[in-house]
């Protein structure tokens, strides 16, 4: 790829960031499509996010991806949010139109698209959702929009717990889905929820390096063959949760599916062009 002065910059702002496959995936897609953009990752956390956004405007970047820990904070720095992003309370994509910043969340649409592509219909189903960060709430919001019946969200009593309660209130008021929020330490409630669930989704960083030997499922007998287990973590590709699920006979969807489909939507928002899906799946080794 020969980068010229006509190229525009697209970023990814997160911390940590060096594990991300997004720069490789997006740059392969941009090169294949012959588009004058380059995509770069920047280590940005909550303490430097405001100045990074000022830099984005000053450099006239086309936009940026946003990942942990900035997804919720980023909502405060854009001029406009999509209805879905408002429901989530977090964004993973910013598009810069001559200094006017629009915030989107493609995490939810990407993850639900991966589920649908597997042939699973979420309508009328019940999901146990682990986590209450930007990715988890995006998945929950999109699932609610697309007709899931009930979401049982479990999260530790940390800084995200009250945000999870507020998220549940927004979804309950604006969709037909019923969302409950429970402390993950309540193992009795967790066991009961899994017993009646159709889908278990990990929206936390548990399983991601350096937590690759950890899983929020302590008792593998809670996993039933009829349960669909989905993962947001893609590094490592086969998380401990997915290993447990496969051993229990569950159908699984790995984190590559969400990465691929959310990235495809981001690409189209930034460039206005179709994402070269089949090519990217091939060169990245994705099976989604």
UniProtKB/Swiss-Prot annotation:
Reaction(s) catalysed by this chain, per the record, are: L-quinate + NAD(+) = 3-dehydroquinate + NADH + H(+); L-quinate + NADP(+) = 3-dehydroquinate + NADPH + H(+); shikimate + NADP(+) = 3-dehydroshikimate + NADPH + H(+); shikimate + NAD(+) = 3-dehydroshikimate + NADH + H(+)
User: InterPro entries per the record?
Assistant: Aminoacid_DH-like_N_sf (IPR046346), NAD(P)-bd_dom_sf (IPR036291), Quinate/Shikimate_DH (IPR022872), SDH_C (IPR041121), Shikimate_DH-bd_N (IPR013708), Shikimate_DH_fam (IPR022893)
Keywords of the record, alphabetical order, are: Amino-acid biosynthesis, Aromatic amino acid biosynthesis, NAD, NADP, Oxidoreductase
Q: Please give the function described in this protein's UniProt entry.
A: The actual biological function of YdiB remains unclear, nor is it known whether 3-dehydroshikimate or quinate represents the natural substrate. Catalyzes the reversible NAD-dependent reduction of both 3-dehydroshikimate (DHSA) and 3-dehydroquinate to yield shikimate (SA) and quinate, respectively. It can use both NAD or NADP for catalysis, however it has higher catalytic efficiency with NAD.
As one GO molecular function, the record gives: quinate 3-dehydrogenase (NAD+) activity
Which residues are involved in binding substrate? 71, 107
Per its record, how is this protein called by name?
A: Quinate/shikimate dehydrogenase
Known partners and oligomeric status? Homodimer.
Designated gene of the protein: ydiB
């Amino acid at each position: 790829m020969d980068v010229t002065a006509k190229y525009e910059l697209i970023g990814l702002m997160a911390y940590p960031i060096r594990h991300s496959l997004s720069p490789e995936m997006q740059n392969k897609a941009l090169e294949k499509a012959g588009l004058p953009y380059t995509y770069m990752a920047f280590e940005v956390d909550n303490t430097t996010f405001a100045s990074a956004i000022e830099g984005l405007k000053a450099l006239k970047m086309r936009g940026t991806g946003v990942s942990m820990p900035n997804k919720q904070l980023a909502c405060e720095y854009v001029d406009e949010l999509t209805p879905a992003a408002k429901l989530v309370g977090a964004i993973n994509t910013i598009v810069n139109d001559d200094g006017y910043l629009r915030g989107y969340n493609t995490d939810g649409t990407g993850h639900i698209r991966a589920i649908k592509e597997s042939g699973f219909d979420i309508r009328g189903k019940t999901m146990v959702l682990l986590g209450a960060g930007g990715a988890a709430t995006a998945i929950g919001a999109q699932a609610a929009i697309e007709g899931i019946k009930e979401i049982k969200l479990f999260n530790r009593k940390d800084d995200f717990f009250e945000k999870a309660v507020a998220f549940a209130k927004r979804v309950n008021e604006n969709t037909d889905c019923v969302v409950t929020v429970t402390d993950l330490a309540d193992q009795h409630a967790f066991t009961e929820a899994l017993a009646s669930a159709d889908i278990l989704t990990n929206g936390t960083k548990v399983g991601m390096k350096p937590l690759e030997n950890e899983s929020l499922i302590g008792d593998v007998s809670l996993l039933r063959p009829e349960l669909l287990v989905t993962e947001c973590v893609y590094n490592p590709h086969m998380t401990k949760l997915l290993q447990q699920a496969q051993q229990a006979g569950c159908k699984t969807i790995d984190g590559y599916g969400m990465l691929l489909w959310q990235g495809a939507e981001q690409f189209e928002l930034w460039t206005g062009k179709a994402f070269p899906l089949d090519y990217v799946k091939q060169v990245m080794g994705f099976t989604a």
